[in-house]
């Protein structure tokens, strides 16, 4: 349950639903597995795991949701080969080239035949709502995946007035300033990874891993008008992460010292451990998010 990515969204007006009312709303889009002729299914499951039923877990005013997606895997190459074989057979038998609509119909028949035997794969995406501070966070590696979850939530609530966090200064400018200065402000520390992109269209990309970023070599790239588009950072010796120029946070890791604070919770009691971990994680992230935003220059005034 410990988040590995952060996509940050600001409510444009207060989130008015409590856990009980939201629970009822989510019932309209419960997850169920794909039927024999369905390509994908998307819905809500309990964030506390398969042995729990609650769809909204609340701890210290914070809410945790979980969306599950199941998709049938149909290799494109297999479909293409089967379709071409069918087309060749029919064109040879009829002595003419098939029309576009006929080919599309054949493809639908092939999909209809293959779907019941297709292997399903599933993924889960957690969503954290912080009503008191007026934002929500999706544990998704891409904005598209986060948007899918937000769209599902919007279907349940009727409306979801959220927008991505908007900063006064573009993150790439601030990160470039940090690297030029050789240090980040506050409790943030530069680590050993960065991506630098040229401001010019074909100016090149530099990716550094396991490298000291405070060197003349790196400064030379910055002097050549390259901007920092990804930067590995550490916050308060508690959280390490990679910050991107779209304000997305990936490869989020919490320190062992933090995670071990819940070692006294009985591990066999899965729900109790999830509850304790969620409270611990959100307690830390509730401090981390505003400090990061402040270090980056703050949000745009409304």
Swiss-Prot record:
Pfam families with a match to the protein in the record: RdgC (PF04381)
Subcellular location: Cytoplasm, Nucleoid
InterPro entries reported for this sequence: RdgC (IPR007476)
Highest rank taxon of the organism: Bacteria
Keywords: Cytoplasm, DNA recombination
GO BP terms in the entry: DNA recombination; regulation of DNA recombination
GO cellular-component term (any): bacterial nucleoid
Gene Ontology molecular function: double-stranded DNA binding
Principal subcellular localization: cytoplasm
Chain segments annotated as transmembrane: none
Homology family: Belongs to the RdgC family.
Its job: May be involved in recombination.
Name of this protein: Recombination-associated protein RdgC
Organism, scientific name: Tolumonas auensis (strain DSM 9187 / NBRC 110442 / TA 4)
Gene: rdgC
């Amino acid at each position: 349950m410990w988040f590995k990515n952060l996509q940050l969204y600001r409510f444009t007006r207060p989130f008015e639903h409590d856990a009980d009312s939201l629970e009822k709303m989510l019932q309209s889009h419960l997850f169920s597995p794909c039927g024999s002729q369905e390509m994908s299914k998307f819905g809500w499951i309990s964030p506390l795991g398969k042995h729990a039923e609650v769809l909204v877990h609340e701890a210290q005013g914070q809410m945790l949701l979980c969306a599950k997606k199941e998709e049938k895997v149909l290799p494109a190459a297999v479909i293409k080969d089967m379709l071409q074989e069918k087309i060749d057979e029919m064109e040879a038998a009829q002595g003419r080239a098939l029309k576009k609509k006929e080919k599309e119909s054949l493809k639908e028949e092939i999909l209809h035949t293959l779907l019941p035997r297709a292997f399903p794969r599933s993924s889960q995406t957690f969503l954290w709502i912080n009503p008191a501070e007026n934002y929500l966070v999706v544990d998704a590696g891409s904005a598209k995946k986060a948007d899918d979850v937000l769209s599902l939530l919007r279907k349940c609530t009727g409306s979801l007035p959220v927008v991505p966090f908007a900063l006064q200064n573009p993150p790439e400018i601030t990160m470039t300033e940090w690297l030029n200065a050789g240090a980040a402000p506050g409790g943030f520390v530069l680590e050993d990874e960065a991506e630098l992109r040229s401001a010019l269209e074909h100016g090149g990309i530099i990716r550094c891993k396991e490298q000291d970023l405070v060197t003349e070599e790196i400064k030379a790239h910055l002097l050549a008008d390259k901007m920092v588009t990804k930067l590995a950072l550490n916050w308060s010796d508690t959280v390490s992460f990679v910050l991107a120029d779209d304000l997305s946070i990936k490869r989020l890791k919490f320190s062992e010292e933090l995670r071990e604070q819940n070692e006294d919770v009985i591990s066999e009691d899965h729900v109790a451990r999830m509850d304790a971990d969620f409270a611990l994680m959100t307690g830390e992230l509730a401090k981390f998010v505003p400090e990061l935003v402040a270090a980056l220059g703050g949000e745009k005034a409304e």
